[in-house]
């Protein structure tokens, strides 16, 4: 048992030893004490808790008491009113007799198996890099898969847009055919009307739709090139990462499930609740997830979102233009049908007028012939001997009456006046008949023009309905655009070619 020596702190005058001797002894003792503390601390520096550094400004025993306070058991109240002591949570060795649980100590060097530990750490680093490469390859592969899906959707939408653009171009050809076919009407039927205005309006609208569809095709082509370039970049980085994990048997989808998501581009999808998702590793120039991979994934995400918006806009434009083109075509056909109905009404009215005029001409001709017969009867016979006795002016009764002055008979004068009046009436009838025939011919020609105009409008409507059918392609509609008049026979070269 140690014996406590009496204190050597006495009055300076009562000391026997020299002051230098006392100071030398105290210095030696202090040096030994510091060496003891340092050696004691250094003895456990290779094996101690991580947070075992005490505050130098606090007394050693107070710092140690504060440091050991969290080790003690905690008293908890039970529902029945009793108490129970439980060790604190966390790692450590539970000392049930001392009611304490000190934290686990960690060695700075894994002695005595330092070589094995370093080899294991190296293997862990290599496996961590392989896992990172596999996870990055899985994310790159899934991003490439989604970009491929978006490429397929974009190609399908481009085909639909191209078909709609072909329909718009075919509509322009049909409009040109309609204008050209309506140009074969007679001159009197070429007076500008609302149908011509509708055809001009249709042409302008179709040109506007064509420009819009061509812009959509240019946008989709640029997006297609960007998606293809992004896919190639993702494929290059994915194949580069797969070189490090080529011999691993864990599928890439399983790696994504371990990461807590089924996609690395579409981050809007909630993670799978059954697995604990791994955090996105920060880009490391010398690691598996390089800044180039991060940039490629960010570009894929941006292109995916942009392509979704562009695809929706392209589909909307395609449907709108289809409806607009159908509406414009219906309005043009309705205007042509209205013009046909108006032409048919005029044809019926002109046919009735032509029939009435024909009857009038027949009656006038009959009356004119009767007037000529009457004029011949009024003139009398050509020979004097054919005159009747009552028509002779030299008969005895007339000669006896005309013997006195002023008793001349007006028979001859009145006969001459009546004959002249009948002659003038016949001439007027001839003039009226000539005018009636001229008007009849003009009316018949106008009726024929109306019939041709009606037939041309009917052919235009029929042509439009036939050419606008979806089964008629652009090349078939283009064959009808020729430079020769369809009312004339085609050139011999074309005839010979067709016969062959």
UniProtKB/Swiss-Prot annotation:
GO terms for cellular component: axonemal B tubule inner sheath; sperm flagellum. The modification Phosphotyrosine is found at residue 372. It comes from the Eukaryota. Residues 198-229, 422-448 form a coiled coil. Keywords: Cell projection, Cilium, Coiled coil, Cytoplasm, Cytoskeleton, Flagellum, Phosphoprotein. Pfam families: Tektin. InterPro entries: Tektin-like, TEKTL1. Residues 1-25, 265-286 are annotated as: Disordered. GO terms for biological process: flagellated sperm motility. It is found in: Cytoplasm, Cytoskeleton, Flagellum axoneme. The modification Phosphoserine is found at residue 14. Microtubule inner protein component of sperm flagellar doublet microtubules. Microtubule inner protein (MIP) part of the dynein-decorated doublet microtubules (DMTs) in sperm flagellar axoneme, which is required for motile flagellum beating. Forms an extensive interaction network cross-linking the lumen of axonemal doublet microtubules. This is Tektin-like protein 1. It comes from Rattus norvegicus (Rat).
């Amino acid at each position: 048992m140690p014996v406590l020596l009496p204190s050597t702190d006495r009055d300076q005058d009562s000391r026997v030893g020299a002051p230098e001797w006392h100071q030398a002894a105290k210095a030696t003792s202090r040096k030994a004490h510091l060496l003891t503390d340092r050696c004691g601390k250094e003895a456990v520096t290779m094996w101690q808790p991580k947070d075992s550094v005490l505050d130098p400004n606090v007394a050693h025993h107070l710092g140690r008491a504060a440091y050991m306070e969290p080790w003690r058991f905690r008293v908890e109240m039970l529902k029945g009113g009793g108490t129970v002591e439980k060790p604190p949570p966390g790692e450590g060795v539970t000392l049930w007799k001392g009611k304490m649980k000190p934290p686990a100590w960690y060695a700075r060097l894994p002695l005595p198996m330092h070589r094995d530990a370093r080899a294991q750490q190296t293997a862990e680093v290599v496996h961590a890099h392989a896992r990172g490469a596999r996870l990055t390859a899985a994310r790159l592969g899934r991003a490439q898969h989604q970009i491929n899906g978006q490429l397929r959707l974009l190609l399908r939408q481009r085909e639909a847009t191209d078909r709609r653009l072909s329909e718009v171009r075919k509509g322009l050809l049909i409009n040109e055919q309609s204008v050209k076919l309506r140009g074969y009407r007679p001159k009197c039927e070429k007076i500008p009307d609302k149908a011509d205005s509708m055809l001009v309006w249709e042409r302008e609208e179709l040109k506007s739709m064509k420009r819009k569809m061509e812009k959509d095709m240019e946008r989709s082509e640029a997006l297609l090139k960007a998606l293809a370039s992004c896919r190639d970049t993702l494929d290059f980085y994915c194949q580069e990462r797969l070189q490090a994990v080529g011999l691993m048997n864990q599928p890439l989808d399983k790696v994504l499930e371990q990461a807590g998501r089924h996609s690395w581009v579409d981050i809007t999808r909630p993670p799978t609740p059954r697995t604990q998702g791994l955090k996105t590793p920060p880009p490391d120039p010398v690691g598996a997830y390089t800044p180039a991979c991060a940039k490629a994934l960010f570009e894929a995400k941006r292109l995916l979102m942009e392509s979704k918006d562009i695809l929706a806009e392209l589909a909307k434009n395609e449907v709108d233009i289809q409806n607009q083109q159908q509406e414009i075509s219906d309005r043009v056909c309705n205007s042509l049908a209205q013009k046909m109905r108006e032409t048919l009404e005029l044809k019926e009215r002109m046919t009735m007028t032509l029939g009435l005029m024909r009857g009038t001409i027949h009656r006038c001709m009959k009356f004119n012939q009767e007037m000529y017969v009457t004029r011949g009867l009024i003139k009398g016979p050509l020979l004097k001997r054919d005159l009747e006795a009552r028509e002779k002016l030299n008969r005895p009764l007339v000669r006896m009456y005309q013997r006195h002055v002023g008793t001349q008979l007006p028979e001859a004068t009145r006969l001459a006046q009546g004959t002249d009046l009948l002659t003038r009436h016949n001439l007027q009838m001839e003039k009226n008949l000539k005018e009636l025939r001229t008007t009849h011919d003009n009316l018949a020609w106008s009726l024929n023009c109306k019939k041709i105009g009606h037939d041309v409008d009917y052919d235009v409507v029929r042509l439009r309905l036939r050419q606008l059918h979806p089964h008629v392609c652009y090349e078939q509609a283009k064959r009808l655009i020729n430079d020769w008049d369809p009312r004339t026979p085609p050139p011999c070269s074309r005839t010979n070619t067709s016969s062959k």
